[in-house]
């Protein structure tokens, strides 16, 4: 079996999901039966890379690819072409919810996607949207994290002010980082009290580095950048927090790993309603939801949640809602197709 994956130490969702799938395949089938094609910096040695891809496709029965926005335009047609000679199973595991929107304007790529053995998407809506494009070879492989789920007896129920909030995603404007900062500042200033603190975790998007450096210099003491956390340590870090904030502006998010992290740690989420939110979040069950870009609604939710009892009431439901996103459950659909 071969998996096409970048061999790097990035902490973005694409890299984390790729590593999670690779690690679960190794656990299931043994490292000696899994070969990895490293896509990191492949353009520096294109001839070597192309030869390796051909060789690996020829020598395997199952190829799993996880290309993102740019890679899908290259790797799907490339492997489809060579597969005319080798007739192997090619599976595409999509990271995020963006693929239907991309394909809607690219008929040629839609035709290529139809040729794949199976396309695994993260959400129900993605499957429905691809079906409208006459792509029928689709199944749902929910995003998952190979992390422990907090034991219910270890849930935190005692809180005092200031209440600790955090974000745990890529640091960029489109993830709503500035909205989170603005809302927390406004609530604290209006009450003339530090009701909330905010810790910002995650890799800083390269397009946002300069802006964020300037922004950090203006932040009050109760808001700080807390750096990056290894994926496997997320539950341990997050479990102390009152709420995780996810005010994303990306409407095509899939099942964000940060949401899985928070719920696995027993931490309810305050999130904007992206297209696929309903596949993982239920308002006032494991989360508190507001319409995307509605800062007033976001602010009102946090004002309302100064009442600690409203959060404590749903703490145990966060753990109950995460079961289907456990690795051993999520991967069954991929194993089934590999072993056909």
Task: Locate each region found by the language model.
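Conserved donor-binding/catalytic core segment of Leloir-type glycosyltransferases
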Residues: 2, 156-175, 180-186, 198-199
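Glycosyltransferase donor-sugar binding loop
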Residues: 38-41, 168, 196-211, 227
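A short, histidine- and acid-enriched strand-loop-helix "catalytic/donor-clamping" loop
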Residues: 68-72, 88-105, 118
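Donor nucleotide-sugar binding/catalytic pocket of nucleotide-sugar-dependent glycosyltransferases
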Residues: 114-152
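Nucleotide-activated donor-binding/catalytic signature segment of Leloir-type glycosyltransferases, i.e.
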Residues: 210-232
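Acidic donor-binding loop of glycosyltransferase active sites
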Residues: 239-253, 267
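Conserved acidic donor-binding segment of nucleotide-sugar-dependent glycosyltransferases
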Residues: 283-284, 288-296, 303-309
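A charged, aromatic-enriched C-terminal amphipathic alpha-helix characteristic of glycosyltransferases
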Residues: 309-339
């Amino acid at each position: 079996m071969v998996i096409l994956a970048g061999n790097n130490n990035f902490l973005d969702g694409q890299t984390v999901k790729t590593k999670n799938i690779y690690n679960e395949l190794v656990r299931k089938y043994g490292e000696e039966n899994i070969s990895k094609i490293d896509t990191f910096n492949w353009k520096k040695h294109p001839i070597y890379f192309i030869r390796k891809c051909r060789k690996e496709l020829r020598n395997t029965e199952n190829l799993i690819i996880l290309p993102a926005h740019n890679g899908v335009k290259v790797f799907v047609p490339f492997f489809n072409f060579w597969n005319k000679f080798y007739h192997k199973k090619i599976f595409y595991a999509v990271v995020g919810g963006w693929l239907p929107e991309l394909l809607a304007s690219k008929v040629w790529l839609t035709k290529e996607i139809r040729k794949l053995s199976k396309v695994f998407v993260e959400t129900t809506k993605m499957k429905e949207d691809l079906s409208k494009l006459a792509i029928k070879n689709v199944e749902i492989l929910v995003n998952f994290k190979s992390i422990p789920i907090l034991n219910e007896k270890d849930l935190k129920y005692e809180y005092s002010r200031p209440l600790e909030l955090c974000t745990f995603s890529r640091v960029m404007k489109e993830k709503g980082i500035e909205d989170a900062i603005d809302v927390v500042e406004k609530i604290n200033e209006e009450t003339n009290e530090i009701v909330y603190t905010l810790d910002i975790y995650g890799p800083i998007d390269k397009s946002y580095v300069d802006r964020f450096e300037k922004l950090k210099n203006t932040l009050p003491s109760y808001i700080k950048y807390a750096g990056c956390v290894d994926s496997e340590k997320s539950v341990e870090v997050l479990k102390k927090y009152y709420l995780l904030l996810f005010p994303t502006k990306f409407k095509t998010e899939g099942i964000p790993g940060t949401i899985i992290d928070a719920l696995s740690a027993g931490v309810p989420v305050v999130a904007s309603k992206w297209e696929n939110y309903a596949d993982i979040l239920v308002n006032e069950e494991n989360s508190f939801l507001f319409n995307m870009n509605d800062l007033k609604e976001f602010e009102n939710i946090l004002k309302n949640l100064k009442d600690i009892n409203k959060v404590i009431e749903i703490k145990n439901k966060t753990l109950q809602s995460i079961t289907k996103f456990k690795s051993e459950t999520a991967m069954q659909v991929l194993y089934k197709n590999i072993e056909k």
